[in-house]
Amino acid sequence: MHFHKSDNMDIEIIGTESLGVRGLCCFVTTAKQRILIDPGIALGYNRYGLLPHPFQVAVDERIQKKIVQRWSEATDIVISHFHGDHIPLADANPYQFNIKKIIGLNPDVRIWAKNPHHLHPIEEKRVEFLSAILKKDLIAAEGITHGAMTFSRPVFHGGKHNNPQTVMMTRIEEDRVFVHTSDIQLLDNEAISQILDWEPDIVLADGPPLYMPNKLSKEQAKRAWRNAKRLSKEVGTLILDHHLMRGYEGVRWLKRLSSETENNVICGADFMNVPRMLLEARRKSLYEDMPVPAGWHEAYGKGKVGTDHYWNLAKGIYKSMNPDDHR
């Protein structure tokens, strides 16, 4: 993979849908800080009635190793919210990032998160587990600045009427301004205004979940488009991924948005200068191209089978993806 460098700031997108997994994980290096944001990934457990294909599991394994490496190097870790594709989990399924992998690793790292009174009950339990296992308190970060980082007040996870849960956005400034929006889905106008007030050069944002039309009204889809247009006019590099890139509808949407602005509108893989690896969107074809025997997932969960066979198969079948570029 490649880093995007701008003077004293390096940005690495580690795990998101265009890189083969669910998440919005990145690592930002400044002169004095190494900041890991949303250190967790997952795979859509059931899509089109199919469990994750072993090739996608192979990609997931490699990205998890990278998160462990970046956790060990970080001065700061930011958790925007406590959903299973953004954090280490005590009760992880085989395709999520298990907290056991980072126990005792980098004990002095600072961990920044939402204020406790803005947590959903499910999030509260996960914070308790995280604090107990890591043996450290999480720092309430909303609205404060520390070094290169500034944190937002809570904004809605998607639209305010869809979901009462919230996320925390992060601004990092060093020569340029980078903003990680977390799962705003471009549905909250106030979140968009906050981003623009921060005057960013580069934004990594979650786009609308177009792959779930039953959960996204026509009015919401229009609002997401309007907000994407607002950002694309003002932000030099707008990276849209996560929910947006779970289906080919999102790919077409991104292409249309890019064609209507002079600024750079791309996905995470484009930013990292590697081929797009839209593995969830193409799960059906993965099974057609590389059949999976019955019982594979159960055996994998018990540690009886691995993924190397499928990784090597995919390298031959999907040469345009260049899987080794993603290692």
Name what the model sees in each region.
Residues 33-34, 105-111, 233-238, 262-263:
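A short helix->loop->beta-strand "cap" motif at the edges of active sites that frequently abuts
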Residues 38-43, 81-84, 113-117, 200, ...:
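Short loop/turn segments at strand-loop or loop-helix junctions that form parts
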